[in-house]
Amino acid sequence: KIFSKRHNWRRKKIMNKLVINIFLLILFSNNCFAKDELKFFIGKNKIDLEGYFIQGGYVKGKTSSKIKIKFENRDIYLGKKNKFILGFGRDYSEVANLKFNIDNKWVNKTLKIKKNKYKIQKIDGLPKKFVSPPKEIYERIIRENKLIAKVRSLNSKIDYTFQDFLLPANGIITGVFGSQRILNGKPRRPHYGIDIAAKKGSKVISPTDAIVRLSKKDLYFTGGTIMLDHGHGITSVYSHLSKVLVKKNDKIQKGDVIGLIGSTGRSTGPHLDWRINWFDQRLDPMMFIKNK
């Protein structure tokens, strides 16, 4: 009986914690949007678009046959089954231009992009050197930013992007995409990811199959950092890690442990900063999670 009571108490405690985490996930996430669909024909070619036509969102597309596509003057790669993806950054304009080549002529399709609403987040207690870096650190920051930009420019012909994404860590959402950040009382750039707070050493997993494109133990702002390539211009970043467990060019599978949560770089406590880009467009990671 004592064992049974103890077992039930533990089970109840776990369920309560799970309910609280789900509530906080809904409370703190900007992602309360339903997916939209858009279907149309370009000549005889049927085009299907599905996703989030909103700042910070993305849409996945499919064509009935091979066709040349441009989006904002970028050539779009068609993968297996003629699938492709487009992304709209945090401050994307209200109109997006998608072009299709029919008989050597470009046909324009205008997409309407909704405006998003963003929160304000105040973070105090950061070391001064991370809020206003000393001049002698500038070259290092520029060099590290170039490494990150190089990975984000990749247009790999792999289709992992179309897998359902897993949440890369268990924990509490403490920071949301797009929020305007005030660090130690000073306005700074918006937050381009989500923060998942958890105990130091908690596991971080890959949300899909991927290729490791960057693996660093100590970047200035982000500390232990991993960048994964999912294909079609979609890359993801995992920051502030206490341990990096994968190497550059490793091919990893969905659910593989890639690192451990920490508080390295510009951080006030152990958490994962998870970000997703479509090339240079910053996207809301929570929009990639199927069962939110």
Where in the sequence are the language-model features?
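Zn2+-dependent peptidoglycan hydrolase active-site motif and core
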Residues: P207-L245, P270-R275
